[in-house]
């Protein structure tokens, strides 16, 4: 409920006024309005505040409709504000939401870079708190879905950020490195270290082969036909959007040059392609 972008109005069976739907359990008799005029305007106001916590030079640039996914603007947007310098460029939920809401981002709010060092000491992933909008998704999925509680709100010079409760590394905090926080992060604040800057050109639905559970995954493949990212399928019956550290990060064996890519059969002591 920290970002409050899921605000709705209850016509029947719920509390009055706009409420964050993610904090209210579903009950019989509820009638919910998700797109009333007041609710839509409130969401836009909330979004305006959220992007003030994130580099948004490209989001409210008047040339956004003419800008391609790989263009680098040298006239209107500073280096630190550009979407192309973010590892989640063109797969950023924040940008997608701005486009979906058709927002007119003539905001007077400015983003001040926090100059927080990139956290790279933990294995397999990186944390950039300069891109965090403190939506609390990572904290909630770690606590409520994974039951881990490795992430928590922290304070830095009076500003709320995300970290560990005791200021330790994630490895020391008991993190399972399942990657659930990365999957729910709407910005580039939490990303996989491997293939961080690689862009996917196609997606494939497959099943994780590390164990017999049968977790369904969406695999992202780059233009060189390398597997660069695995995202758990939230609609799959076996895993319901979750994965273990092997399923999320154990991908490099697929890209190995020594990997067998065709079936072989041994005949007279010699292996031959079938």
Question: Residue ranges of each PLM-predicted region?
Answer:
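Acidic, glycine-enriched active-site microenvironments
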Residues: 6
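Structured interaction patches on ligand/partner-binding surfaces of diverse proteins
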Residues: 21-25
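N-terminal export/assembly segments and adjacent metallocofactor-ligating motifs
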Residues: 1, 11-15, 29-274
């Amino acid at each position: 409920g920290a970002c409050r972008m899921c605000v709705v109005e209850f016509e029947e069976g719920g509390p009055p006024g706009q409420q964050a739907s993610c904090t209210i359990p579903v009950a019989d008799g509820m009638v919910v309005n998700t797109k009333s005029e007041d609710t839509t305007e409130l969401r836009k106001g909330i979004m305006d505040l959220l992007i003030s916590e994130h580099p948004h030079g490209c989001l409210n640039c008047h040339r956004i409709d003419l800008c391609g996914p790989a263009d680098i603007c040298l006239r209107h947007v500073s280096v630190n504000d550009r979407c192309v310098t973010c590892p989640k460029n063109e797969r950023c939920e924040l940008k997608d939401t701005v486009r979906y809401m058709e927002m007119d981002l003539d905001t007077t709010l400015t983003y001040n870079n926090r100059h927080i060092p990139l956290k790279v000491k933990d294995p397999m992933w990186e944390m950039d708190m300069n891109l965090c909008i403190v939506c609390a998704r990572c904290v909630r999925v770690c606590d409520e879905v994974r039951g881990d509680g490795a992430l928590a709100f922290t304070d830095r010079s009076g500003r709320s950020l995300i970290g560990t409760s005791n200021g330790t590394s994630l490895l020391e905090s008991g993190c399972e490195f399942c990657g659930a926080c990365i999957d729910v992060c709407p910005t580039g604040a939490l990303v996989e270290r491997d293939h961080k800057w690689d862009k996917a050109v196609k997606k494939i639905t497959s099943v994780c082969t590390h164990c017999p559970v049968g977790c369904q995954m969406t695999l992202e493949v780059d233009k060189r036909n390398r597997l660069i990212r695995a995202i758990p399928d939230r609609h799959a019956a076996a895993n319901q959007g979750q994965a273990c550290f092997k399923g999320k990060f154990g991908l490099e064996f697929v890209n190995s040059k020594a990997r067998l890519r065709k079936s072989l059969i041994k005949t007279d002591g010699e292996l031959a392609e079938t």
